[in-house]
Amino acid sequence: MARGGDTGCTGPSETSASGAAAIALPGLEGPATDAQCQTLPLTVLKSRSPSPRSLPPALSCPPPQPAMLEHLSSLPTQMDYKGQKLAEQMFQGIILFSAIVGFIYGYVAEQFGWTVYIVMAGFAFSCLLTLPPWPIYRRHPLKWLPVQESSTDDKKPGERKIKRHAKNN
């Protein structure tokens, strides 16, 4: 029986986390299926007079998962250490370059606004280049050590050496 954090529709025999019983609608027996979740709001709206209120939480169904989010979750998100260093250097270099160019152009044109626009464009460009995990940042993957069996079970407690640290006076 689903409780509180369930993502599906609640059927007539289910209760919420607070213990309140769900509303039983005619024609629904057992837990609601996906097809019932799609037609349930229409049934409820037809049975009541129209009102600006939305459906109670017990009768609402979860929104379908968009296909784009499923595609985005399959993209790799890791970045190796050398890639992180490269991304940081590129970010700082682009920001510094755009700040210098923006300052010079703004000084020559006597328009501080152009300095701000050029620095903002440099920031946006550096974010575009460094925030997504592009393949250039994943060229040096980490080599993990193989899992080793722990050998501490074989030693007896008396065989271990006790390390003593020198006292600092």
UniProtKB/Swiss-Prot annotation:
Presence of the UniProt keyword Transmembrane helix in the record: yes
Record's keyword terms, sorted: Endoplasmic reticulum, Membrane, Phosphoprotein, Transmembrane, Transmembrane helix
Pfam families: SPC12
Entry comment on modification after translation: May be phosphorylated.
Main location: endoplasmic reticulum
GO biological process: protein targeting to ER; proteolysis; signal peptide processing; viral protein processing; virion assembly
InterPro entries per the UniProt record, alphabetical: Spc1/SPCS1
Compartment(s) where it occurs, according to its Swiss-Prot or TrEMBL record: Endoplasmic reticulum membrane
Side of membrane Cytoplasmic, spans: 1-93, 137-169
Membrane topology summary: Multi-pass membrane protein
Lumenal topological intervals: 115
The keyword Lipoprotein is annotated on this UniProt entry: no
Annotated spans, Disordered: 148-169
GO-annotated cellular components: endoplasmic reticulum membrane; signal peptidase complex
Region ((Microbial infection) Interaction with JEV NS2B): 91-169
Quaternary structure (record): Component of the signal peptidase complex paralog A (SPC-A) composed of a catalytic subunit SEC11A and three accessory subunits SPCS1, SPCS2 and SPCS3. Component of the signal peptidase complex paralog C (SPC-C) composed of a catalytic subunit SEC11C and three accessory subunits SPCS1, SPCS2 and SPCS3. Within the complex, interacts with SPCS2 and SPCS3. The complex induces a local thinning of the ER membrane which is used to measure the length of the signal peptide (SP) h-region of protein substrates. This ensures the selectivity of the complex towards h-regions shorter than 18-20 amino acids. (Microbial infection) Interacts with hepatitis C virus (HCV) proteins NS2 and E2. Interacts with NS2B from Japanese encephalitis virus (JEV), West Nile virus (WNV), and Zika virus (ZIKV).
Purpose of the protein: Component of the signal peptidase complex (SPC) which catalyzes the cleavage of N-terminal signal sequences from nascent proteins as they are translocated into the lumen of the endoplasmic reticulum. Dispensable for SPC enzymatic activity.
Entry's family note: Belongs to the SPCS1 family.
Protein name: Signal peptidase complex subunit 1
Organism the protein comes from: Homo sapiens (Human)
Gene giving rise to this polypeptide: SPCS1
